[in-house]
Amino acid sequence: YAWYLDQKKIAETEDLCYVVSDKAKKYQARMEVTLPEDDSVRFFADFEVQVFSPYSKGLLLLSDYEDYPEVSFMSTLNNPTNKIMRDVYSLENKRELKGKALAIEQSDEYSYGGTVFVHTSASSHELDPVLFKEIALFDENSFTGPAQEYDMVYCRFEDAITEFGGAIGKDGIIYPKQARQSRYMASSLKPIHVEGDEERLVDYRLSPMLLNTRNSTLGYDNLSGRFMYFMNSYDIPSYDENQYDEVRISETYIGLPWLGWGKNMSGGTYQFSSLFYDPVTDRAALARAHTATGKLKGQDSLVFLSGHHLAEGSVMAVNSGINWLYYSDGGRQLYVLNLSDPDFKFPSIPFECALPDNCRITMLKVSVDNLALFVGVETDRPEKYKGDVYKINAKDGTILEHYQRFGGTPVDMVEKKSVEYD
């Protein structure tokens, strides 16, 4: 007996048991039988074998349990019972993630092959989107220039358009990451030159948030209370040409820490909305529309929220399909801001959803089609897998699905899409 897969012999037994560990794709297979008494007489059958990865398409959740990050996966293909595969990074790579969970994302298939990125405070991991095997590791050994320490408070590498990203270290410095580079670019200068005035240097203390664009990034400085747009002048000698060596400081004073941002639509084009909140003073503000450089669009773009329900631990998300901004009150209650309301008469409308009393919202993620909102909650169950995820209707809050014990405390989620060879 002989079995072949793409012309490669894989077995010589009557019954075949074979694990495909290469690519999930369509293979050409052949089973061949040779009569023992006459080697010249052979029987064979050719057929196709379609191999799918168990991680082809579904929900990827990054959660945290007592500073132990973990990745869980739930397939949305032929999974009627919503079976959840937990700790899939450790399962496929035979080692555990370290640090504090920060973010998980998947790149665009056509420009970056659908690569999955997992970010923690200790390291960033580039994973094969089919096998979840680690392709690249970015840690303290992945810097172009010297780094004071590797302990990130924010990190995202991938943007579907720009393929550019970066991280903020505990040292308050930005470490850019360019697509397909196996390292971080040189860290941003601190203090840094002001655009148009090479003699002026300013210090900064960033909120743990970035809006990355091509060869630049938008940060928010808690010292000046303004957006700072980090760029490279190409005039100041550095370790590499991508080092951020100058900033453009926004003219608009906000004076509150940056909580988060999201894309919204206006006239068929994307713009950005940002939420600001200071838990010490309990003051909040909304930048309804601004550019990727931090410039506010329109005189009424900055609104200080008097009737807000933000609190320490609040999370937010923007639905670009209906231009709503969702945020939590630090507990189980959701609120919505209508970014398209011209008068903005109702800045905080309760968004009712029948979540249980014994939970705290820790994650909000709008679905790719903008029709649903994934709500990650931490329950009071005395166990490791205390994190649940609810899929709710994006307009009325109706619970569509409940994924119980998805992981630890939910931090970030991505709707993993299949790639061409899966």
Regions found by a protein language model. Give the residues of each.
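Surface-exposed, flexible coil segments in extracellular/virion-facing regions
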Residues: A2-S21
